[in-house]
């Protein structure tokens, strides 16, 4: 429950963060399909004997090359099979957290028997769409998720419709937190971060706890491309400086290594993405530790980072050709800049420089290489902060950057929402040809 004395707008900010910053086990696109399969299996009479699934092109893109936690296998078919046979239908993005060794073995056997199929839904106007249909003999259950990774819109079985999400909004119902957030500004977000009672935002410290554990696991060197562990090793060899900049990159990329490599630890996600959550969290944590920040300062910096990342990403399609680690890192830049000097001017300059730097990075599907993009984005964020501290930034005379940071963000998001749609189609076409 909220403190009734809190500013109503601040309450919506907090709700937005609570809705968009959640624990997630495994890359969220395969996990969305696993959840659909798990919920369908829960509705089915008898054990699952066969799984059919259909996904949007964007979800297929983000599911082709990523490891499903605990399985050592990549791709959507194993996610669908394990969700159906070992998923917890009530666990949301942590649907696979209780999957047993037996369930994993059964899922692999179902896959080997050719009883699992995943296809692109055609036609499909939705960017995020997953549908799983599970069978037991002639009996079946089908679940459809649309728009958000856990947004179930339809449940149906051989006996009829079980649930359909109502599209209409009841009269007098409050606007969603994200709708409210779309009308705010970075300046208003900063005012909130500076003035909100610590007790109201203490919960955001959980993002540091979860993502730091994932980072520590990544530093073991056995996950994904082990970028974090490799860079740490190069520090020991004297090929890379042991400094704050290196620590930011190493600890952030290590968390992504573990995440994309299939570690069975949850990430605290942001905007439906574990890597975005990692990118919005770890650079801020490292800088906070460097300055000896207490829990309250860390919580305020993390709240600024996560809320800014949500604010920017809310102006984008849920999935697109733009690598959203870059927009999450803009949030991290805000959080790090706040820790150093707290000025709005520094924060806005850092974000503007980020937009002038890494805006062209494409999303070519979830995979181990996401950790490369996470490390690049984290490095760019700290560089932008250092520039801003010296009163230097990419100016409104250059490229898509405008004189006003809000317009710069709008320009970036317009590119991703419109012009990069053809880029997305080309990426999906290339990836589909490789999968044949």
Curated annotation (Swiss-Prot):
Entry GO MF terms: L-cysteine desulfhydrase activity
InterPro entries: Ser_deHydtase-like_asu (IPR005130), UPF0597 (IPR021144)
GO biological process: cysteine catabolic process; L-cysteine catabolic process to pyruvate; response to L-cysteine
Induction and repression of expression: Transcription induced by L-cysteine (in vivo), under control of DecR. Member of the dlsT(yhaO)-yhaM operon.
Disruption phenotype: Slightly increased sensitivity to excess L-cysteine, the effect is more pronounced in M9 minimal medium. Cells produce about 9% of wild-type levels of hydrogen sulfide in the presence of excess cysteine.
Record function comment: Plays a role in L-cysteine detoxification; it has been speculated to be a cysteine desulfhydrase.
Family in the record: Belongs to the UPF0597 family.
Protein name from the UniProt record: UPF0597 protein YhaM
Organism: Escherichia coli (strain K12)
Higher taxonomy: Bacteria, Pseudomonadati, Pseudomonadota, Gammaproteobacteria, Enterobacterales
